Structure formats: C-alpha cells, structure tokens
Amino acid sequence: MEEIHRYLQPDSSQQHNFLYPLIFQEYIYALAQDHGLNRNRSILLENSGYNNKFSFLIVKRLITRMDQQNHLIISTNDSNKNPFLGCNKSLYSQMISEGFACIVEIPFSIRLISSLSSFEGKKIFKSHNLRSIHSTFPFLEDNFSHLNYVLDILIPYPVHLEILVQTLRYWVKDASSLHLLRFFLHEYCNLNSLITSKKPGYSFSKKNQRFFFFLYNSYVYECESTFVFLRNQSSHLRSTSFGALLERIYFYGKIERLVEAFAKDFQVTLWLFKDPVMHYVRYEGKSILASKGTFPWMNKWKFYLVNFWQCHFSMYFNTGRIHINQLSNHSRDFMGYLSSVRLNHSMVRSQMLENSFLINNPIKKFDTLVPIIPLIGSLAKAHFCTGLGHPISKPVWSDLSDSDIIDRFGRICRNLFHYYSGSSKKKTLYRIKYILRLSCARTLARKHKSTVRTFLKRSGSELLEEFLTSEEEVLSLTFPRASSSLWGVYRSRIWYLDIFCINDLANSQ
C-alpha cells in the first residue's frame, strides 16, 4: 500500500508553491517570446502570424495592470467592461497565456530531469535529444517489426475546461496560479475556441497554441500515467487496496461509493494487463498501442480503453475512435512519413551432400516512405507549384534580392532532405527538389522580367548551385565509409536528434 501511495503522491520537491510571483517578472515573457519565435519558424519561411507588437514597454504595462489587485476582481458577467486588458485585449491575453505556459512547465521540466538522472549511474541524459521527433522512429524500428496488431487511437479531449484546471492542480500546489488559470480560461476562452472538432481528430486554435497544448498534454499525461501504472503493477495490485488509485483518477473528488463499485469489477478486468509485449506511442493527438496478441485480444483492449477513458476521466469517447489494424498489411501517416511493416524475402541456398535447395526466409521490417501527395499539396498551398505538381513562380518574393530568393528556396530544400533523411527511398525528394529549383528559377525570371531560359543563359547555371549541396552529399562527407557509393546513400536511413517540431510540409493532415 505504501508503494502505491509513493507512486500516486508526488514528493515535496515536485509540489511547487512559488510559481505565481513569476508572472510579474519581465524575463518570463522574454523567454516565452524567444520560444514562440523558434517554434513558429516554418520550413516554408512564411510569416507564422506571431504578433510583432511585442516589446518590454507592453510587458511593463501588463505587469502594472496585474499588480493592481482591484483589476483582478472581475465579474464573469461583465467581460466587455473589463479594465484589466483594456483595448489590447487580444495581445495581452496572448502574452499572459504564453507567459503562464512558460511558468507552469517548470514543475514538469524538473520532474523530467529528476527521472532521467536515475538512468546510467545517475548521469543526466541530454533531454533535448529526447525531444527530437526522429528519436521515436528508432524505437519503432526496434519493436514494431516483431508485433502483429496495432490499435490506431484518436485521443479524446476533455468535455469541460474545469477538468484541465483540476488536472494541473495535482502538480502545482499554488492556489494563486490556479485561480489565474481558471480566470483566464473562463473569461477569455471557451471549449469551441480551444478545440476545433470539424475533422475526425482534433486541432487547436492557432492563437495561444503553446498554452493550450501544454494543458492538453498535461491532462493526457495524467490519464496515461495511471494507465501505465495499472499495466506495470498488475500483479501487485491484486492484493492491495484501490482507494488511493481512485483518488488520483478523480482528482480529489468524492468517490466513496465508486470505490466499492470499482473494487468489485477490478479483479475481473485486471487480467487484461498481463500482455508481456505491449508498446505505446503518442503523437499529434493520436496514439498507437501495438501488441503481439491476436485480433480478439486487441478487441478486448479496444473496449477497455473506451470504458477507461470515458468512465474514469470524463472524456468523450466511442469505439469509432479506435481502429484495429494488422501491421503486415496496413500503412499509416506517422509524423509526416508513410510507415508500414513489410516482409522482405531473403533467399538462402543450402547444400547437403550433392543436393542443394533454396530457403525463403521472410523477415519483417519497419519501413518509412516519403508521402508524395501530401508534400505536393503543401507546396501547392504555399504557391510553389500547382495541385498537379507543376512549378510556378513565387510572386510575393519578387521584391527580395537574388541571393535572398535563392537562400530561401535552398533552405526549404535542405530542411526537407534533413527531415526525410529517414526514408528508405528518397526518389520522391528529388522530384520535390526539381519543383523547388524550377520555382526558384521562375521567381528570379519574373523579377527580372525575362523567361527562365534567357535568365539562366545570362546569369549562368552556377546561380542555382545552392540546390546542389543536398543531404546526400553532406552525408558522403560526414560518413565516407558508410556512404562510399550513391546507392548506399540512397538506401540508408539517418535519424537526427535536432528536429523539435513539425512544420507544414511534414504534417500528415
């Protein structure tokens, strides 16, 4: 019982009571501004819509308004006359949300560092490597090729904003910060603006995106931590009480009656967690639960997850959000890649005395490919080509210098080769490179009021040498032995640990 309480109750180092004063510090908003610029920098080099009116003068005005306690006593029925944000309501609300998101991430960052320090003789890992999107793919390569079925799950969202506050309350023991969070959510936000459910999945509103992503991820993390705890401690929980477990599930709610009802059915459902080979991955509002079990086994997991999230976490969920697929004959959009598990047939000649025969050894392999249609769609949306992939000029860049135009196109091309370096077949990337190169030439020709052929003949082909330094040539210089031939570079898959966000061209939607 004490072991369960130690897991469910955070220690004193994880309970922070000093977060609220940070909302009045100027450097917090500077950190949030820097984070926002780095996060919103798109691979297409377009303006991401971040408000350029940010300045320390506005920060000082905002802090002065918040420091006056009379402005914090606000009627929820009279939001239009609220003097707190004044005429800059949109800008101030965005700044508060980004600053608050930067502050409340502190407890989770401390928890991450403390958990990483327990590995490899108390040596702290480089957490920025674990943040890389590409760090997920080696895990899938090592584990998914041995599994049979996978549950593709669209993660549900909470039905009320107060649930988000109650979730964060478990980790942040700071009443002032939580009151500010509750005020901000109910006064300036609503569930419709937070989550747009027009698509089968979900999407967050672009305004205050970092703030809402943090709230949503903290809530899903709470659900997942309880789920993983049940999975790892199934044999131990058979002989223990479940009061502390339910207390955490319901976030300090009144659950005396539920304890009795849940305890009766708990022994029946607990055997489901005895699967020794189970892997879970979450990404982009979706998750994957892969197992070596059979189809009936995965079907039981499906209905258990629906009941688990819907009954115990107040999440709107139905069976249509979970699909059972066989890994050997199913492809999925995963982090901008088209991933699948395919069979590679290896023929081995064996000889016994005078007789020889061939042995066919099928080997499962996790494969990642570049999706050409979504990529061309993203390029067409950014006005680099038509919907059919025919290159066109970029008129909005015609006012830039020739070097700036070439640099922008070259940077996009290098970023694409960098992100999709994990693909086993890079032929698609050379088609994208051709589109960008010809689009660059047409943009330059449009600027100089000339045709593409005339412009290249007058300027020389060396003007577009920016595109010749592709990812493969960089790899051949970095790994001369492994990349001694062009075919070896073409077939090799390289995963990087410096890619922290997905941009427009890498979005599976």
UniProtKB/Swiss-Prot annotation:
Q: Which domain of life is it from?
A: Eukaryota
Q: Name one GO biological process term.
A: RNA splicing
List, alphabetically, the InterPro entries matched: Domain_X (IPR024937), Maturase_MatK (IPR002866), Maturase_MatK_N (IPR024942)
What are the protein's UniProt keywords?
Chloroplast, mRNA processing, Plastid, RNA-binding, tRNA processing
The answer to keyword Flavoprotein applying to this record is no
List the molecular function annotations (GO) for this entry: RNA binding
What broad class describes the main subcellular location of this protein? Answer: plastid
Q: Where in the cell is it found?
A: Plastid, Chloroplast
GO CC entries: chloroplast
Q: What does this protein do?
A: Usually encoded in the trnK tRNA gene intron. Probably assists in splicing its own and other chloroplast group II introns.
What PANTHER family does the database record attribute to this sequence?
MATURASE K (PTHR34811:SF1)
Sequence similarity: Belongs to the intron maturase 2 family. MatK subfamily.
Q: What name is this protein filed under?
A: Maturase K
In its UniProt entry, the species of origin is given as Solanum lycopersicum (Tomato)
Print the organism lineage: Eukaryota, Viridiplantae, Streptophyta, Embryophyta, Tracheophyta
